[in-house]
From Swiss-Prot:
UniProt catalytic activity: a 2'-deoxyribonucleoside 5'-diphosphate + ATP = a 2'-deoxyribonucleoside 5'-triphosphate + ADP; a ribonucleoside 5'-diphosphate + ATP = a ribonucleoside 5'-triphosphate + ADP
Function: Major role in the synthesis of nucleoside triphosphates other than ATP. The ATP gamma phosphate is transferred to the NDP beta phosphate via a ping-pong mechanism, using a phosphorylated active-site intermediate.
Main location: cytoplasm
Enzyme class, UniProt record, top EC level: transferase
GO MF annotation terms: ATP binding; metal ion binding; nucleoside diphosphate kinase activity
EC number from the UniProt entry: 2.7.4.6
Name of the protein in question: Nucleoside diphosphate kinase
Organism annotation: Oceanobacillus iheyensis (strain DSM 14371 / CIP 107618 / JCM 11309 / KCTC 3954 / HTE831)
Gene (name only): ndk
Phosphoserine: residues bearing it: 122
Family matches, as Pfam families: NDK
InterPro entries recorded: NDK-like_dom, NDK-like_dom_sf, Nucleoside_diP_kinase
Length: 148
């Protein structure tokens, strides 16, 4: 079963949107395999966003993601990466469709509530950055018989 990494960013945590976001993925039928509230260190932020290191907004990105707690999650299910991207909406909340997370709650590109893996490779990399093997729980979701 495919896995993806999602993270409610500091703005989403401060605005108390964790429950709403988790509910959307549970309602969709996906399985939560790992979750934790954590403070991202500068080192972890720089590693996580290393692909943007040469971009002018890199420093602001690191400052923002380390400015408060985040809620890191691992979700599992069929096509979870692509579906999560659709559920999140476009990066710029002003361009995101209504009923997406960013369309409903996002205000600006810099504070857009949620991060999600964009590929299977990114998901694997991000999951191992934020979670140890022992923090990912493997279990059979009984509702899967009704979903898949």
């Amino acid at each position: 079963m495919e896995k993806t990494f999602l993270m409610v960013k500091p703005d989403g945590v401060q605005r108390e949107l964790i429950g709403e976001i988790v509910k959307r993925f549970e309602t969709k039928g996906y399985k939560l395999a790992g979750a934790k509230l954590m403070q991202v260190s500068n080192q972890l932020a720089e590693t996580h966003y290393s692909e943007h290191k040469e971009r002018p907004f890199f420093g602001e990105l690191v400052d923002f993601i380390t400015s408060g707690p985040v809620f890191a999650m691992v979700w599992e299910g069929e096509n979870v990466i692509a579906t999560a991207r659709k559920m999140m909406g476009k990066t710029n909340p002003l361009e995101a469709d209504p009923s997406t997370i960013r369309g409903d709650f996002g205000i600006s590109v810099g504070k857009n509530i949620i991060h999600g893996s964009d590929s299977a490779e990114s998901a694997e990399r991000e999951i191992t950055l934020f979670f140890t093997e022992n923090e990912i729980v493997s279990y059979e979701k009984q509702a899967n018989n009704w979903i898949y």
